[in-house]
Each structure stands twice: as structure tokens, then as C-alpha cells.
Amino acid sequence: MRLLLWWVLVLSLFLDPLRAVEEHETDAVDLFLIFNQINQLNQVIETYKKNPERSAEISLYNTQKNDLIKSLTSKVLNERDKIGIDINQNLKEQEKIKKRLSKSIKGDDFYTFMKDRLSLDILLIDETLYRFIDKIRSSIDIFSEQKDVESISDAFLLRLGQFKLYTFPKNLGNVKMHELEQMFSDYELRLNTYTEVLRYIKNHPKEVLPKNLIMEVNMDFVLNKISKVLPFTAHSLQVSKIALALMILALLLGLRKLITWLLALLLDRIFEIMQRNKKMHVNVQSSIVSPVSVFLALFSCDVALDIFYYPNASPPKVSMWVGAVYIMLLAWLVIALFKGYGEALVTNVATKSTHNFRKEVINLILKVVYFLIFIVALLGVLKQLGFNVSAIIASLGIGGLAVALAVKDVLANFFASVILLLDNSFSQGDWIVCGEVEGTVVEMGLRRTTIRAFDNALLSVPNSELAGKPIRNWSRRKVGRRIKMEIGLTYSSSQSALQLCVKDIKEMLENHPKIANGADSALQNASDYRYMFKKDIVSIDDFLGYKNNLFVFLDQFADSSINILVYCFSKTVVWEEWLEVKEDVMLKIMGIVEKHHLSFAFPSQSLYVESLPEVSLKEGAKI
């Protein structure tokens, strides 16, 4: 991101050749001055709390103070802004006071002793503040997490909590007492102010962490250079922000294919699986283009929002929702990468194992991994949105049991719908048979699935019933709808004629353009590169729905015929087209039967009479 912003800076300088390049830096902010401003506001607020007439103004000063704290928090990590505390001078002053305290006795001159003691404590809390900011700047970078900021804040809050609160004897003079009380008031106010700011940083660590590396770049300088290039005078800062955001958006989207290619190349080098297969590399690259493109678009919008709100942080709700979308996009990208490389990796492990390795285990591993990715992403989104994930999981205990008993059937249907979705048993528009139910799936809901029967009746089937019974899905066929028939020929057929008839029928089917053969297999026709790995896990033909068996044999001596079995599959699975193919096959079989002078047999019965009695006919004729 820093390189992108510097690229924009160079572009803006290139577009302004008539101007000499001037090193322009905005005045650095003194963080200690901001602390003092917050301290002064706290002093005013404490004063107004004692005056009921001014209490209405407290909210206004609180708003100003909160704005200053937010601004200060956003600048803590920016090393261009001075801390504002001369730590060397501070340490020298501490040494001087410590020497005086070591020589003085509290009982001899209480006023001088307490004055030095308070001065030393003020220097110590200033040093603590300096050490805190220095620790943040040296320890926090773009890879740091919220817990890192929280742990540093906790450590320095503990140090501030160790400073003492003092009480003064009443035998001091009014002037000295007033002076000590004033010093103590300043000391206490400063201690409370520092504590308040550190607690805010601890509770809002996101505002300290680098956001898209914008905190690392001189945004004032970049926006200033852009405003000089643009021909606008009014609202130049806002226009510069919009221009910078649009340039970053266009640049990131323009680089998406390059970034995708580099990511795929990096993964190839890591896994060393697909380096020799250029087609697979292209397919994997195309599968991750969509999530990477959406991620870059969201990232660009996120950067644009940071620029719009600069120098303040983006609203917490915006950051919350953007973070949730980031998690979902990350899950999408991980699933896409796992489908490309994960299956190949697992398959390679399986093929290198012994022959006793069960292929079902690989399928189970793949499904479990997909499910875990989904669950982790879901929990991450819930946590990002502010839900207490631990409480949600705990609530699934006793309370969940009571609810489950009350709505057992509803939950059964709901979880059945989840199982059906995960199993992918059918989709909308599929022709299925489940028990006595047959028809086309219209819609699958959380409780029931609606099916349109072939008599046009609408059936509503509970999901639990579908999940608990075998489902026959006729639509999950790519190539191959069965044609099976028995061809009965008369017993008067000769052996040679039958053999030639069987041979010709088989040759006709093998050469038929619409009958499936050995070339119609999944590996020959499937374009998805992943199936080359799945062939070692499952039968790809059965997995995708390819059937190309072809059998023609003399099958049976029936009561009235000699039967020839014809068993084959049409290439099409569409009913009407299948009927046309079947009709064509039957007509060609009839031609082959006629060619060999054979006859179709039909159910018949022969009656043999050994002798007949004489029968008298008209006019005395005899037989």
C-alpha cells in the first residue's frame, strides 16, 4: 500500500512539470501539547462540575476532549509527530531532585521535601508517557494485532497506578499549603489525564494499529501535491481525497490479474504440484480471480474511506462491517485455493500410500475441511460483529437442550435441510424419486421441500423425510440413458444367421452417432482439471454420471423365441431425444433382422394331432 501511495505521488509530480519539486512537509504535531490540551479540558470540566450554573457546558468540553483523544490516538504511531518530551532533560532533572531528596529529611522541612517529591513524580509520569509512546512506535507494525497494543497499555497503566496520592499536615502556613495543594492538584490531574488516554488506547487498539499503511505515509504531502495538480480551488482537500481514492481504486483493480498470477505462481512454488501442467495453472488462476478481484475492490474502498476520514479513523461500525466482509472473502479465497491445490495435495498423498488406503477417508477429509472453513468463517464474522462467541457456544448447552425438546420436529427439518445442502443430493429443477414421491424439485426451504409432480400437483415434503430415505436423482446424468430390450427370433432361425445378426447389431450400435461408447467418458469430456486428481479417489464416470456400456449377446431360449439381449446407453439424457434415438435403433434392428432372413417371434402355441376320426360330410362324402 505504501508503494501504491508513493506511485500516486510520483504520478502527481509528473503531471506538474512546470513546478519545481519542493520538499514540503507540514509542521509536525507535538503530542505532548495535545496531552496538555486534554489536561486543560479536564481541569475546566472539574471546575464546572463544582458550579451547577456551568454544568450544561460540560458535555461540550467532553466532546472536545474526546475528539482530541481520538486525534492523539491516530497520531501515536506516526513517527513524524514529535512526542514533545525532552527525555534527556527530564532524566537530568530527576537526578538533581533525587540528590536533593537524598540529602534532605522529611521531618526537617516538609514543604521543601514534598515540593521536590511532587516535582519528581511529575517528571516520572512524563517519562512513563514518553516510554509508552516510544514502546508503541518500536513494537507495533503492520503485522501487529490488537492484543499487542492491549498488553503494552496494560503494562504502562500498571506503572501509572503505582504513583502515590499524598496528604498534607494542617500545621503548614496558608501560602505553603496552597502552593503544595496546587502542585498536587496539577500532579493528580496530569496522572488522571495520562491514565484516561492510555485506557482509551487499550480499549480502542484498532485506532492505533496501522490501517492499510496510511499511517506510514505523509498523507498531507500527498494530498497537497494532488491539490496543486487539479484545477479546483474550492474544497481542494475534499477533491484531492476523492482523486486519490479513485486512482488507488483504478490501480488496484488494474493490477488484479497480475496479483492473481503472482499468487498462483507462489503457491505453485510452495506445493510443486502443478508446475508442469500449464492448463491446470490457468484453471486455478481463473478460479481465484473472482475472490481476489472482490477483495481488491473492497480493499480499495477501505483505503478510500480512510482517506476521506483522514486524519481521523473510520467510524467503528464501518470498520466492523468491512472486517466481516474481509473474513467472508478470505474464506471464499481459501476454499477456491483448496479446491485447486488442496485436493491435488491430498490425492498425491493417497496415491503414494499403500494400496490398503481407503479412498472414502479422503472424501471425508475434504468434506470436513470445507465444513471447518465454513464454521471458522461464521464464528469469525460473528465475533467481528460484536457477538460473544463463547456465550453462543455455551448457550447451546442446557438451554439449547430445552429448546430442542420443545421444537424437535422443527429442528429435525432444519438440520435435515443443512444435511441435504451439504450432501448436495439434489438441486432445484432436478427430477427425483423418494419413496412414493416423484417429480421436479421446485424449492428447498428450511422446513420442507416443494416438488412438482408429473400430474402437475404440488407436493410439500418435510426435509427430515427426504434426508432419511434413499433419493433417486434422474437429473444427475451427463451422458447415458439406458436402452434395454429383448429381441425374440423364431426357433426356425439358423445358428449362423443368429451369429451374423448379433454381430451386425453390435457393429450398428458401436458406430451409431447417438449411442454412447468408450470415448464418452468423464475424463475425456470433463473440462475441470480437478477431476484428474479425483480419478484416484472415486470412479469419475459414476461420480459425474457417465455410462457407456454396450452389450449385444444371445441371451435366452424362451418358450416361444430365441432372445437377443441389447443393452446400451444413448448419449443424450433428455427424454424426447432418448425416445428418438431408441426409435432409430429399433428400426435399424428390424432392417438387420430382415437382412438375414430372420423372423420376429411372438407368443404362440403349436398343436400336434396324431390321428383324426372319419367325419361324414354332405352328400355322403368321406374324409
From Swiss-Prot:
It holds the Pfam family MS_channel_1st. Gene3D superfamilies: 1.10.287.1260, 2.30.30.60, 3.30.70.100. It is a multi-pass membrane protein. Coiled coil: none annotated. Its main location: membrane. SUPFAM superfamilies: Mechanosensitive channel protein MscS (YggB), C-terminal domain, Mechanosensitive channel protein MscS (YggB), transmembrane region, Sm-like ribonucleoproteins. Keywords: Cell membrane, Membrane, Transmembrane, Transmembrane helix. One of its GO terms (biological process) is transmembrane transport. The keyword Transmembrane applies. InterPro entries: LSM_dom_sf, MS_channel_1st, MS_channel_C, MscS_beta-dom_sf, MscS_channel_2nd, MscS_channel_C_sf, MscS_channel_CS, MscS_channel_TM-2. It is found in: Cell membrane. The chain crosses the membrane at residues 242-262, 288-308, 318-338, 361-381, 387-407. Belongs to the MscS (TC 1.A.23) family. This is Uncharacterized MscS family protein jhp_0969. It comes from Helicobacter pylori (strain J99 / ATCC 700824) (Campylobacter pylori J99).
